[in-house]
Amino acid sequence: MKRILGLFLVAAMCLSLCACGQSKAAKTVEEAIEAIGEVSIDSNETIANATKLYDILTDSEKSEIPLETRLALLDAQAEFEHLRGEVVYKNAKEAYEKLKEVESLCVTGMDAIYGAWYFGIYEADDGYSFYSMAADVPGISSDELEAAASALGLSYSSVERDWQNALYIVEQVLTTRGDYDTISKNMTEAEKILQSLTEEYDDYTYYPKLKDYFAAVAAYVEFYKAPSGSFQQLKDTINNYENGIRTLSSDVGFLFTK
């Protein structure tokens, strides 16, 4: 009888040891998973640490970790990737919207520059005032032209004498409106966002078109700030820039339709 009781005690002790005999490695992983807590965009290191420790366990050691704890790690990984994706989406969309504003300012501004170029070469001698010039310069009023000319120390007769003065006057209007400042500010901010996306989220490779869009807009901005070539070349150059940008803008905009 004593022998039988002894066997029962040994068996009970073995069962107890099996239940409580979690290895040190498994215990460390369980604690690392519990340390994750509520998942946020700042949980990257704690989740990565717990995942790394879990991955190096043997199958036997992994089985020592409660199922609900293992599932908690999977849930944390999924939640972090979801939050990470939202951050990337938000930042990339912000960059796109800034570039889109730059595109719009360049297109409308270049329309005015083209009109001024045309007027200065072909119509200035037949005009009588800035009212005549405004008819060929879309989006800019005669009052704005007159105020810009005055700021530059020019008059309408200055346009008659030298067609390039028409360009200077329109560029002054755009400067007064703050278009050039907005363009520079937006391009700087968009570039910073793209740099951050590249450095911190380089695995999000589905945004290459956003970078292409940035490059295309940046090239147009350089031309917009200092248009060159003959008047005959001007229209083709504008069309080439704007057609390329329009296509990229459409492709990139599709990414942000949700």
State what each model feature region is.
Residues Q22-R84:
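Beta-rich interaction/scaffold domains
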Residues L53-S60, I193, L248-D251:
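Residue position in alpha-helical solenoids
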Residues R3, G21-Q22:
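Cys/His-rich metal-coordination motifs, chiefly Zn-binding "fingers/knuckles"
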Residues R70-L73, Q77, R84-T176, Y180-A190, ...:
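C-terminal amphipathic alpha-helix
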Residues C14, E34, K52, D136, ...:
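Short stretches within intrinsically disordered, low-complexity N-terminal or propeptide regions
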Residues S16-A19:
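C-terminal motif of bacterial Sec signal peptides marking the signal peptidase cleavage site
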Residues M1-A11:
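Positively charged n-region of N-terminal signal peptides that target proteins for export
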